[in-house]
């Protein structure tokens, strides 16, 4: 869309942040995997095979789809690996905005936690029932809501370090995005944990039902 609407320049410049797009042709989306949230987001990512660089563009409503047709049945034939990697991507779109070191809004936290609980619950169903329409529908809708800006309200926009790191891995090694994120997040979490252990304790309790202790490190060690 950016390339067609801005023919005077190399579209890669938008991803290098050396130029800013001024237009985009209207886009419609038909998701064939629940993962990226592109069907409702204002961001996009491409890989340049000249150097194997993976970059995201400047977030803009210009490239937000004008309409989306969402049919969970289109996801039935996905391999288990792609289905579960997609679920990780959805979780991470929420978690990148959830794990911030500022005071957040209770309602946004509740929305984010509900999304994460829904994805985890239904991802387990799909391990045994890949053709479960309701589970596919829940995850597809969660994927849209996780990356349309809703879960970033009152969070300062999010951290996004894990996504930036994964883009480097994905560009160099052609790693499935969700799989790369799952490999990175644990190390990132340990690195930032001491900055806000209360946040990790809240996550452990509200998402995984780990009993809450006054000592945050006992809840989320």
PLM regions and their residue ranges:
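Active-site segments that bind and position negatively charged phosphate/pyrophosphate groups
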Residues: 97-220
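A glycine/threonine-rich phosphate-anchoring loop and its flanking beta-alpha core
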Residues: 2-104, 202
């Amino acid at each position: 869309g950016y390339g067609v609407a801005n023919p005077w320049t190399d579209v890669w410049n938008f991803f290098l942040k050396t130029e800013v797009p001024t237009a985009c042709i209207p886009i419609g989306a038909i998701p064939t995997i629940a993962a990226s949230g592109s069907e409702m987001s204002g961001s996009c990512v491409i890989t340049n095979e000249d150097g194997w660089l993976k970059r995201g563009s400047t977030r803009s409503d210009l490239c937000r789809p004008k309409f989306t047709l969402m049919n969970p049945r289109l996801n039935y034939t996905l391999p288990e690996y792609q289905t579960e990697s997609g679920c990780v991507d959805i979780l991470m779109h929420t978690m990148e905005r959830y794990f911030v070191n500022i005071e957040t809004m209770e309602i946004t936290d509740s929305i984010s936690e509900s999304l994460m609980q829904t994805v985890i619950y239904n991802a387990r169903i799909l391990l045994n029932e890949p053709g479960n329409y309701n589970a596919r529908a829940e995850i597809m809708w969660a994927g849209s809501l996780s990356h349309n800006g809703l879960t970033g309200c009152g969070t300062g926009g999010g951290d996004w370090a894990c996504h930036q790191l994964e883009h480097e891995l994905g560009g160099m090694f052609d790693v499935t995005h969700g799989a790369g994120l799952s490999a990175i997040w644990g190390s990132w979490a340990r690195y930032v944990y001491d900055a806000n252990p209360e946040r990790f304790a809240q996550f452990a309790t509200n998402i995984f039902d780990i009993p809450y202790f006054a000592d945050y490190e006992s809840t989320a060690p």
